[in-house]
Amino acid sequence: MATNMDSFSGYIKIENSVFAFTLRDQIVTLLPAYSEPDQRGKALDVFSSESMKEPAFFYGHDESLHQIAFYKQSAVNQGKLGLSSSAKFSTPLIVKSAGNASGFYSKLTEEWNKFHAITFYGGNINSICDPENAIFRVRDVDGDRRVTRLEKRDLSEYTKTTKVTIGGVSADLTVSVFESPAPKNPDNPQSYSLGELNSFIRLSFTSAQDFSTIERYYTTMRILVAILTKQDNVHFEVYLSQRDLKDMYYKSAYCKIYDGSEEYLDNNTNTIISIARIFDQIPNLIQAIDNGNLNIFRDLLPKNRRDLRSISISNVQDLCTALEMAYYWSERHEEKDEYIENLKISIKKAIKEFVANNPGVDPNNETTLSSCFGYLSFTLKQRINTLYNENKEIIDIIASRNGTPNVCLETIKSFVDLRNGKTHSGIFAWNENAKLFYPLFTLVYACLLNYIGVDDETVKEIITCVF
């Protein structure tokens, strides 16, 4: 990121009061910018109103006159800073203008708190889209020396665009690569660097978007990258752009987003799903994320190095939840559910006959039949077994490769019993079939790829390559 977003000071205006602020490690401290005690007290009174408990953006500028926006999610806390009264809040999102001079603002075609495109780049995005796809190496001879020259491919060779919809808003999703200049070396000012390549995913919109939409677009992209990298602790940079009168994008702001991750991991490209392999299905994947159908992945995927090396009972519970959801992605569940509906019809018929022969008993009101009847369905072990049978060839390869127990109804039952024991009694005992976690984790991914429309052969290639 080209600008400091972790610690700085400046002024912001909240309603009709001006405050000096200091940002340090996500915490914004506010001091009323007035000398008179009465004015300072009146300024702080603004935080007592009910409206201040609602999420909002506070706008101002830093000491170098860059415009600033802090996102406030909850109430502002009041206290003391030395002898002065102050207020504090934690911000999960900071937006800072990309320029601070009149020339910068003259190029904006909308108010500064609007954008036509949001770009996510670097970090784990470089894992799912290798930036070296944009270059090729040419070997040549220079006199007596053999040299290798780097040349950039044509833009069309490493750029792809598709249509997606997020929150009811249509956008163009573009995946490509850009070159960033390297920072100057203070120890050798005359040195020359080629800079660095970063892959990016950009969402661009026909109509300008408000800052309030940043969180939704970021969350969608974060889950997308997490799914493809198979880990939740992903990272990348974010900036905003406006479209100028020549239909070119002009960088308008940088974003700093605090996601709560304790550590970040960059991936071995052999363990990730390349976005290029499923690019045609990205609109379907984005739709599933936007609908909330894939939120379980936030719990299921590892969040740090420790999670990569161990399995907890919470992981087992989350995996069972994910498998329950995956069952409803499957085409077979409709066939199975039809069986359940026919069973319910038969039960209703039997109850009707029973009541006719026993008029003094009302099963619906005098027994727990209604509640049992409402939850009539296949057991989780049967649902998982259905999914396994649909993906048997792939999952057997993964189980054999990793030396785990064979997947069958018996071992699935033993695995589900771990979840049930913890959920219902708080007591569970690890057994050999806990090792079933990895092939069943793989099964969730196979089901997801099928769900978003990846063909069977490509699913097999992806699963056997990255798991």
Where are the language model's segments positioned?
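Acidic-enriched, low-complexity/disordered segments with a strong bias for Aspartate over Glutamate
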Residues: 6, 25, 38, 45, ...
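Intrinsically disordered, low-complexity N-terminal regions enriched in serine/proline/glycine
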Residues: 3, 7-10, 33, 70, ...
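Internal, Lys/Arg-enriched amphipathic helical interaction segments that engage polyanionic partners
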Residues: 211-285
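Context-gated lysine
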Residues: 13, 42, 53, 72, ...
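Serine/threonine-rich low-complexity intrinsically disordered regions
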Residues: 72, 96, 100, 107, ...
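Amphipathic, oligomerization/interface secondary-structure segments
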Residues: 261-467
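Long, contiguous, compositionally biased segments that the model treats as domain-scale units
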Residues: 1-228, 232
